[in-house]
Swiss-Prot record:
This is Heterogeneous nuclear rnp K-like protein 2. Belongs to the HEK2 family. PROSITE patterns: KH_TYPE_1. SUPFAM superfamilies: Eukaryotic type KH-domain (KH-domain type I) (SSF54791). It is found in: Cytoplasm; Cytoplasm, P-body; Nucleus; Chromosome, Telomere. The gene is HEK2. Keywords: Chromatin regulator, Chromosome, Cytoplasm, mRNA transport, Nucleus, Phosphoprotein, Repeat, RNA-binding, Telomere, Translation regulation, Transport. GO terms for biological process: 3'-UTR-mediated mRNA stabilization; chromatin organization; intracellular mRNA localization; mRNA stabilization; mRNA transport; regulation of translation; telomere maintenance; telomere maintenance via telomerase. Present with 15600 molecules/cell in log phase SD medium. Residues 370-381 have a biased composition (Basic and acidic residues). RNA-binding protein involved in the correct localization of transcripts in the cell. RNA localization is a widespread mechanism for achieving localized protein synthesis. Required for the asymmetric localization to the daughter cell nucleus of the ASH1 transcript, coding for a specific repressor of transcription. Overexpression inhibits translation of the ASH1 transcript. Involved in the stability of transcripts such as the MTL1 mRNA. Involved in structural and functional organization of telomeric chromatin and regulates silencing at the HMR locus. One of its GO terms (molecular function) is mRNA 3'-UTR AU-rich region binding. Binds RNA. Residues 15-33 have a biased composition (Low complexity).
Amino acid sequence: MSQFFEAATPVAIPTNNTNGGSSDAGSAATGGAPVVGTTAQPTINHRLLLSLKEAAKIIGTKGSTISRIRAANAVKIGISEKVPGCSDRILSCAGNVINVANAIGDIVDVLNKRNPENEDAAEGEAEEHYYFHFLNHILPAPSKDEIRDLQQLEDIGYVRLIVANSHISSIIGKAGATIKSLINKHGVKIVASKDFLPASDERIIEIQGFPGSITNVLIEISEIILSDVDVRFSTERSYFPHLKKSSGEPTSPSTSSNTRIELKIPELYVGAIIGRGMNRIKNLKTFTKTNIVVERKDDDDKDENFRKFIITSKFPKNVKLAESMLLKNLNTEIEKRENYKRKLEAAEGDATVVTERSDSASFLEEKEEPQENHDNKEEQS
């Protein structure tokens, strides 16, 4: 029996409506604006692999499309710079889990839209074969037998989600149980690439389906990643678009010509610097275009109160930028904790003063009462 694609309305957090209007909303997949979550939610940073044409389509005229998606979903979206000679770019989308999933659903909707003035060009674009094989879809195009409503066939889109290899096994699950459950539950197709992206420890998870269904499955994938505690972050390398060497080997971010800086961060602040799900350190690596390795602690490590952060890049200015931002994050975290400590001490001090004043007042009342009795006795005499 063929797998049927299922259209779905993205899950959304209801917002506090302060304008007196209706709080109901859909998503781009259902014709409305996605509901943006305002309550505290776990945050995630997803990265998508895009072709140059896809990146241009998402950016839009003078950045109008990407700005609209960013504002509508309250997320941070950025696309890597265009590298001469490279056919791919990376889109990063960071925010709370549901908002990020909604934003990516909107991105799928944008990529699905055809130019009605040039249908031939649109068909040619869909069938384009890329030299960089990771841009070529792993999954076959959907057939008429796999959809209930033929008019919705063009609404089915793709996402190339970049995922660290350490998370792939959790998404697939034991004997493929988790990925099968996601496929059956949300009416989508999902497959993981066998090959690693060049000079990285990351692979592609390709998702095919309606924008709303992709949104919902991304929420569950995000939860799997965030709850995955067995993360070997110290050795993982993130993919970034780059040219290959003349020998055919990809340029590695850890070559001998790289600039390298080592920083020792107090163990107490390592978790805050890395961030939940490694979001903070990943954002720093993406923004500065550097590779940052956090060394594991050894049992015989003499500096047990510190952890070593190693920053490398072929551009010295990028390393310096990453170093300054890392130290700034550290100083901000130290200052935040010091301020919190001072507030606690001040609150405890205020409570002590109030108690002392209360005791003093009680003591004075006890002293004054005998004096009043003595005065009364004098008046009577």
